[in-house]
């Protein structure tokens, strides 16, 4: 049902009662999911332009200039609500939707990333959601031949009842082949191609704009789309061939709000109208009505603008790939969205009003009185036991059980595989891209502004340890109910933090999506604010890339950046039962300089190993690097007055661990930013010495801790 206030606005504009079909169009296109009515004022604060940005926000995906005539398409989407109701299909179609966004820009998809957020795996329900979502992503991505090269998986009890499935997709094409969703000329035909239209996903856009109820699994299952990756692969090849042959004037994939959304947005973007003949749509089910035909979100469908003389050629291509296709309307000079069904006009709406008339507003915001939970833990009597507890946490442990289900080498571009700070793909003989994703939800819950800044800095450092400078950022802004002033305050401040940090690094925010109403009636919880981002950067492949693990005995270990005692939102506090207590470590003012110095050190070719320090702090970072060999570290001189657990587990941003056989030369490159040589690589254990403590952890103990998630899943 349309909100009463919206209905009043619509009646006034139309001068009459809207028809049932018109109400459906407004219900979906004016939903939070489609119109960003609560978030639009905040999204305008991002810097979205830059020297490499060809197309920024507003199209199906952004287009970023690379080199040698190549451009990158990048987009990010969420499929959160559907993945709770039907986890396999919800996750699978989340992949399919963002992949079609890339295709509709004329680019071939070359990489996926999947930041995922779950409740702890100690309940059958959370375990089921986790397993099925991973299977859904793997089942779809593997079948269409697009590698998943990086990801993040984070567990927290607040995601019980509302897991988050965010997907980043990257594509590649020549600049002259770039396509847009901006309609070109009145009189051109609209062709719907791909799968036939059924009733699956009906009302998906409006479904994604409300909280999840206790009965959601049963009641909302029809709102979840069902995907077919083999059809998606055919749609991909057919679309790219049609674009390559010059038949397509503009193009848009069918996602939220189905044909009604895609065809109206395509026409409106070019200042034109559209006349749709709903009967002409290839239908999967008999006796579908106009409402269902227009708004069903059946997957694997595209709408093309085609000149009349090219219609037969496009339909021949559709037939060649054994797909469904038909002319379902045309573009008009009159800027109206008109729908005919069985000889009658069932909708006739000013198109700009439909696609851009939803009232937007910045909602009331108010800082929560109590943001902290629990209290700071005492310094542990058994430091090694605490250390091992952190290493064994599912948030710190290896995610090999997940990424081994993905084909991460298909297309033969993968240079750095999953399991390191960022994935790396080869684009040309000399250049590649690094990709990273994620955020720190617990820190953002305590301090949304700092949490937003930290997300940018951490991902930038993930790229930096591979020598990559950031080119572009996309985001999925996952929050609770924006009508709650405290939630909107979180949202507003996290967005401001993201934007400020991105500007400090001169990286434009070129696209993404907003997912609100992530709350669960079943668990009486809202998700922690989760401003998940994807970041890509350019890598020089002529210089050997450092490993994320210790690689050469005798290398000097260098700590870059400054460690501070603030521990708010840390994995250590969570493992010690402290909840979200304490102050979140601030992003240092010299973070851009630190990141730049690390990039220069990597580009020098003098590093054998490099790793970002984030979740779990220096302790977890060192342990992670001890995959093949150990190291001896002495921090007694640099820990200052910090307690041992503070120094080991602080998650202060803008830090990295480097290993080199040429410490003097690397230190010269790091001149001007905080750094210190803290030890050497070698041996069969990690040894850490401080003022008042010594730790000895064998490689076997580290391996067992890192395999905790894999062992848990393999035990069934």
UniProtKB/Swiss-Prot annotation:
GO biological processes: 'de novo' IMP biosynthetic process
Pathway: Purine metabolism; IMP biosynthesis via de novo pathway; 5-amino-1-(5-phospho-D-ribosyl)imidazole from N(2)-formyl-N(1)-(5-phospho-D-ribosyl)glycinamide: step 1/2
InterPro entries the UniProt entry points to: PRibForGlyAmidine_synth_PurL (IPR010074), PurL_linker (IPR041609), PurM-like_C_dom (IPR010918), PurM-like_C_sf (IPR036676), PurM-like_N (IPR016188), PurM-like_N_sf (IPR036921)
EC supergroup of this enzyme: ligase
Residues annotated to bind Mg(2+) 1: 77, 513
Chain sites annotated for binding ATP: 36, 475, 512
Cellular-component GO terms for this entry: cytoplasm
Enzyme Commission number(s) from the entry: 6.3.5.3
One Pfam family here: AIRS
SUBUNIT field: Monomer. Part of the FGAM synthase complex composed of 1 PurL, 1 PurQ and 2 PurS subunits.
NCBIfam families for the chain: FGAM_synth_II, PRK01213.1
Official protein name in the record: Phosphoribosylformylglycinamidine synthase subunit PurL
Phylogenetic placement of the source organism: Archaea, Methanobacteriati, Methanobacteriota, Stenosarchaea group, Methanomicrobia
């Amino acid at each position: 049902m349309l909100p009463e206030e919206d209905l009043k606005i619509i009646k006034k504009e139309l001068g009459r009662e809207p028809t049932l079909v018109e109400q459906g169009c407004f219900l979906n296109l004016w939903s939070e999911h489609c119109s960003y009515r609560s978030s639009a004022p905040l999204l305008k604060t991002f810097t979205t332009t830059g020297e490499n940005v060809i197309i920024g926000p507003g199209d199906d995906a952004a287009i970023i200039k690379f080199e040698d005539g190549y451009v990158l398409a990048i987009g990010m989407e969420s499929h959160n609500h559907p993945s709770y109701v039907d986890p396999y299909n919800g996750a699978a179609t989340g992949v399919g939707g963002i992949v079609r966004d890339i295709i509709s820009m004329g680019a071939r998809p070359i990489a996926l990333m999947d930041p995922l957020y779950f409740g702890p795996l100690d309940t059958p329900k959370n375990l089921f959601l986790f397993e099925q979502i991973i299977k859904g992503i793997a089942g779809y991505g593997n079948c269409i031949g697009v590698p998943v090269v990086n990801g993040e998986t984070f567990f927290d009890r607040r995601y019980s009842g509302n897991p988050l499935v965010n997907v980043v997709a990257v594509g590649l094409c020549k600049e002259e082949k770039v396509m847009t969703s901006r309609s070109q000329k009145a009189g051109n035909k609209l062709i719907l191609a791909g799968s036939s239209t059924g009733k699956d996903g009906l009302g998906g856009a409006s479904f994604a704009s409300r909280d999840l109820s206790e009965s959601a699994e049963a009641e909302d299952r029809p709102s979840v789309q069902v995907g077919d990756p083999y059809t998606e692969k055919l749609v991909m090849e057919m679309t790219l061939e049609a674009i390559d042959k010059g038949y397509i004037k503009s193009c848009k994939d069918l996602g939220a709000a189905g044909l009604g959304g895609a065809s109206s947005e395509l026409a409106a973007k070019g200042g034109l109208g559209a006349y749709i003949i709903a009967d002409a749509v290839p239908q999967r089910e008999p006796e579908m009505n106009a409402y269902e035909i227009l708004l069903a979100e059946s997957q694997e469908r595209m709408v093309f603008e085609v000149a009349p003389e090219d219609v037969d050629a496009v339909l021949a291509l559709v037939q060649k790939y054994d797909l469904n296709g038909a002319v379902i309307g045309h573009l008009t000079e009159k800027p109206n969205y008109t729908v005919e069904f069985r000889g009658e006009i069932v909708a006739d709406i000013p198109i700009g009003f439909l696609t851009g008339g939803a009232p937007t507003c910045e909602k009331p915001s108010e800082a929560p009185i109590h943001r902290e939970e629990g209290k700071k833990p005492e310094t542990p009597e058994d430091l090694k036991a605490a250390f091992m507890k952190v290493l064994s946490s599912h948030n710190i442990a290896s995610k090999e059980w997940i990424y081994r289900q993905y084909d991460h080498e298909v297309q033969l571009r993968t240079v750095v595989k999953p399991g390191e700070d960022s994935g790396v793909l080869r684009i040309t003989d000399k250049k590649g891209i690094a990709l990273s994703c994620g955020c720190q939800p617990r820190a953002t819950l305590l301090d949304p502004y700092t949490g937003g800044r930290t997300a940018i800095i951490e991902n930038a450092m993930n790229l930096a340890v591979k020598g990559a400078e950031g080119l572009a950022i996309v985001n999925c802004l996952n929050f609770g109910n924006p009508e709650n002033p405290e939630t909107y305050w979180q949202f507003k401040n996290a967005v401001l933090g993201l934007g400020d940090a991105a500007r400090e690094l001169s990286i434009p925010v070129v696209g993404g999506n907003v997912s609100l109403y992530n709350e669960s009636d079943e668990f009486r919880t809202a998700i922690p604010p989760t401003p998940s981002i994807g970041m890509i950067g350019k890598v020089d492949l002529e210089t050997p890339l450092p490993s994320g693990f210790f690689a050469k005995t005798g290398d000097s270990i260098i700590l870059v950046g400054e460690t501070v005692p603030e521990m708010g939102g840390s994995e250590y506090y969570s493992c010690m039962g402290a909840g979200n207590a304490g102050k979140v470590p601030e992003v240092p003012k010299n973070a851009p300089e630190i990141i730049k110095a690390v990039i220069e050190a990597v580009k020098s070719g003098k590093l054998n190993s490099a790793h970002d320090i984030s979740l779990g702090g220096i302790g977890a970072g060192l342990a992670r690097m001890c995959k093949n060999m150990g190291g001896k570290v002495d921090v007694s001189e640099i820990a200052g007055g910090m307690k041992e657990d503070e120094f080991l587990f602080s998650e202060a941003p803008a830090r990295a661990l480097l290993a080199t056989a040429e410490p003097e030369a690397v230190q010269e490159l790091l001149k001007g930013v905080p750094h210190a040589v803290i030890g050497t690589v070698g041996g069969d254990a990690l040894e850490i010495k401080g003022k008042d403590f010594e730790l000895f952890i064998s490689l076997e103990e580290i391996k067992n801790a890192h395999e905790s998630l894999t062992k848990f899943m393999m035990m069934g």
